[in-house]
């Protein structure tokens, strides 16, 4: 019988990968970490049974998470990444002319596994762990606690697990208020928000909470390899930024595989019933 890794979503929906072998498994202080060699998508990183990425396709997540916000902001110089222990989000941020990017990851084991076995970070994680990267800094700790006590960010990116379970606090009004205070004016906050079809209630709830806090709130989706796509993202704006418009000249300098200015125009095409529900909030 062929071996497979299956992630089960609500209502009995599953995403499966045929696997060659399990490479790694560990129960860290926070979660179960697994790495598999898949048949057609490279290595798969899973946390508590949920797919975080497959190495042949991870850019379909990291690019739409990072670049729309970075290109919509007029001058993003200081960036905070909450989560993102695999290094992919920081890697994409550093394609831009930033002065500093700080990554706050609660689970150091995720960083070590990603550095040694996933290797999508172009050596960033090693440099960050040793404090030797000129622009990218690392803090091992709770992103919620960090953001309570730190200010002055142009862009804040939440690269967290799905909006259920332990990460649910990162989709609360309380957290969003700390984020708003931590942003410069103008500033942009972006977070992944789960499967459009399977986490619809969580998406609507998070959108409603963000509307209480931010000056403008946007939603968009993107087809992500390895996830129950389309995958939702939420954006909160502090100040006067039109997230639907990006700097196309800056975009030309980026090395991109999935997201680009042409794709940006399609980001906001949510299914009709979800679009109408969010517009009523």
Curated annotation (Swiss-Prot):
Name the residues that span the membrane.
none
Q: Name one GO biological process term.
A: spermidine biosynthetic process
Catalytic activity as recorded in UniProt: cadaverine + S-adenosyl 3-(methylsulfanyl)propylamine = aminopropylcadaverine + S-methyl-5'-thioadenosine + H(+); S-adenosyl 3-(methylsulfanyl)propylamine + agmatine = N(1)-(3-aminopropyl)agmatine + S-methyl-5'-thioadenosine + H(+); S-adenosyl 3-(methylsulfanyl)propylamine + putrescine = S-methyl-5'-thioadenosine + spermidine + H(+); S-adenosyl 3-(methylsulfanyl)propylamine + propane-1,3-diamine = norspermidine + S-methyl-5'-thioadenosine + H(+)
Specify the enzyme's EC class, one word: transferase
State which pathway it belongs to. Amine and polyamine biosynthesis; spermidine biosynthesis; spermidine from putrescine: step 1/1
Q: What keyword terms does UniProt attach to this protein?
A: Cytoplasm, Polyamine biosynthesis, Spermidine biosynthesis, Transferase
- SUPFAM superfamilies, per database record: S-adenosyl-L-methionine-dependent methyltransferases (SSF53335)
According to the lineage, what is the superkingdom? Archaea
Q: Name one GO molecular function term.
A: cadaverine aminopropyltransferase activity
Mainly localized where? cytoplasm
E.C. number, please? 2.5.1.23, 2.5.1.-, 2.5.1.104, 2.5.1.16
Q: What induces it?
A: At temperatures higher than 95 degrees Celsius or by oxidative shock.
Describe the location of the PABS domain by residue ranges: 6-238
Keyword check for Isomerase, yes or no: no
User: By its UniProt entry, which Pfam families does this protein fall under?
Assistant: Spermine_synt_N (PF17284), Spermine_synth (PF01564)
- The entry's spermidine-binding residues are 62, 86, 159-162
User: Sorted alphabetically, which PROSITE patterns does this protein's record hold?
Assistant: PABS_1, PABS_2
Q: Which residues bind S-methyl-5'-thioadenosine?
A: 31, 105, 142-143, 166
> InterPro entries under this entry?
PABS, PABS_CS, SAM-dependent_MTases_sf, Spermi_synthase, Spermidine_synt_N, Spermidine_synt_N_sf
What about temperature dependence? Answer: Optimum temperature is 90 degrees Celsius. The enzyme is highly thermophilic. 50% activity is still observable at 103 degrees Celsius.
Question: Where is it located?
Answer: Cytoplasm
Q: Where is the active site?
A: 159
Could you tell me which PANTHER family the record lists for this protein? SPERMIDINE SYNTHASE, SPERMIDINE/SPERMINE SYNTHASE
Q: What does this protein do?
A: Involved in the biosynthesis of polyamines which are thought to support the growth of thermophilic microorganisms under high-temperature conditions. It seems that long-chain and branched-chain of polyamines effectively stabilize DNA and RNA, respectively. Catalyzes the irreversible transfer of a propylamine group from the amino donor S-adenosylmethioninamine (decarboxy-AdoMet) to various amine acceptors such as agmatine, cadaverine (1,5-diaminopentane), putrescine (1,4-diaminobutane) and 1,3-diaminopropane.
Family from the record: Belongs to the spermidine/spermine synthase family.
Protein name per the record: Polyamine aminopropyltransferase
Originating organism: Pyrococcus furiosus (strain ATCC 43587 / DSM 3638 / JCM 8422 / Vc1)
């Amino acid at each position: 019988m062929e071996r497979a890794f299956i992630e089960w979503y609500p209502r009995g929906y599953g995403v499966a990968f045929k696997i060659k072998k399990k490479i790694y498994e560990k129960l860290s202080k926070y979660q179960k970490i697994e790495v598999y060699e898949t048949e057609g998508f490279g290595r798969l990183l899973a946390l508590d049974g949920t797919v975080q990425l497959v190495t042949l396709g991870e850019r379909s997540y990291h690019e739409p998470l990072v670049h729309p916000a970075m290109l919509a902001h007029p001058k993003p110089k200081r960036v905070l990444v909450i989560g993102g222990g695999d290094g992919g989000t920081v890697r994409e941020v550093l394609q831009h002319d930033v002065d500093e990017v700080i990554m706050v990851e609660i689970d150091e084991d995720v960083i070590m596994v990603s550095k040694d076995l996933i290797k999508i970070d172009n050596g960033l994680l090693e440099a960050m762990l040793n404090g030797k990267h000129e622009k990218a800094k690392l803090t091992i700790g709770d992103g919620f606690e960090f953001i309570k006590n730190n200010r002055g960010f142009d862009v804040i990116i939440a690269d967290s697990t799905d909006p259920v379970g332990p990460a649910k606090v990162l989709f609360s009004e309380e957290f969003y208020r700390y984020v708003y205070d931590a942003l410069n004016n103008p500033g942009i906050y972006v977070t992944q928000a789960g499967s459009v079809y399977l986490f619809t209630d969580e998406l609507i709830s998070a959108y409603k909470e963000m509307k209480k806090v931010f000056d403008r709130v946007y939603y968009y989706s993107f087809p992500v390899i390895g996830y129950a796509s389309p995958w939702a993202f939420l954006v909160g704006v502090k100040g006067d930024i039109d997230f639907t418009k990006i700097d196309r000249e800056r975009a030309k300098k980026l090395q991109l595989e999935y997201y680009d200015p042409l794709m940006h125009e399609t980001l906001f095409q949510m299914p009709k019933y979800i679009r109408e529900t969010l517009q009523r909030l």
